[in-house]
Amino acid sequence: MTPPVLLYGHPPPTLFREPEGAVQVSPLDPGGVDLAETPEDAFASALILAPPGRLEREWVLARTLQLLPPGAQVIALAPNDRGGSRIAPALRAFGCEVTDEPRRRHRICRTLRPAHPVGLDTALEAGGPRLDPRLGLWTQPGVFSWDRPDPGTALLLGAAPALKGRGADLGCGIGVLALHALESSEVSAIELWDLDRRAIACARRNVAGARASFHHGDVRRMGQGGGDLDFVVMNPPFHDGGREDWALGAAFISIAARRLRPGGVCWLTANRHLPYEATLGEAFSSVHLRAETGGFKVYEAIR
């Protein structure tokens, strides 16, 4: 039986049709396979929508070349404004011969896996998980705010009081807000949710103890149950595929309200320009602006 195609992300259908039987390995796909744990020679070829960050992109390309047999085809593409022009140089640095074609505001690179690629270990180490001494936390290139404290999160940490009861950190990243919540001995349990498998893996290493549970999944598809939480903390995403999408944050707000019991509290931080006030007002009985800076704001919303 011919091995399947390795598929990373979802290339635009106007450029490529996803191969039948392909195995999705993007960390942003909860139903996918973990590329870091995949055995070698499990795939016949690869089709990659390359991520925008340099270290993340080079890690994906290096790991793909490590897994494929010599001579296997690799097609990697990205939009022009999200690193497309940097794919070919990265592949050439690994010892690949590359064709680089512009099409529909993308760059499409094709290569065959060389018999003896070079520099893979260096790229895998640079783009892999690490304990960041500045953060004091495990992190990895590609996850939210992976190499620096997020100012919106910091503002929320300074504004929120000690919490209690059962809670959730929606879009938890590497677990900063959950860690703060668990400083209170009155917090009995907290769920950590994130779409990014790498973020959940880091959060598992950062947030210890039986009170925390971890969920790799799309918060918007959490299910219909609700009314079981005393608090929610969150810094909801507002980008989808590199473009601003205010509906993402609005969906998180609605789901937070659904999960909270009457009287439960949601602490939310967001960029100042995001228009969440109307959604908060519709979903919660009372809403208070608790902190604000030039770029960020923090709300306390009571169910």
Where in this protein do the model-derived segments appear?
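Conserved SAM/SAH cofactor-binding pocket of Class I
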Residues: M1-G31, D150-M234
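Accessory substrate-recognition/RNA-binding modules or partner subunits associated with SAM-dependent
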Residues: T2-A115, W267, H273, E277-F284, ...
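Conserved proline-anchored active-site loop of SAM-dependent methyltransferases
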Residues: S45-L55, L170-L177, L229-G242, A256
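A short glycine-rich, Lys/Arg-flanked "PGG" loop and its adjoining helix->strand segment in the class I
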Residues: W59-P70, A250-P262
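Short beta->alpha hinge that forms the Motif I/post-I loop of the SAM-binding pocket
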Residues: P79, D194-R197, L248, N271-R272
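SAM-dependent Rossmann-like transferase core, predominantly class I methyltransferases
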Residues: E101-K164
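Conserved short alpha-helix immediately C-terminal to the canonical SAM/SAH-binding motif I
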Residues: A199, F252, Y276
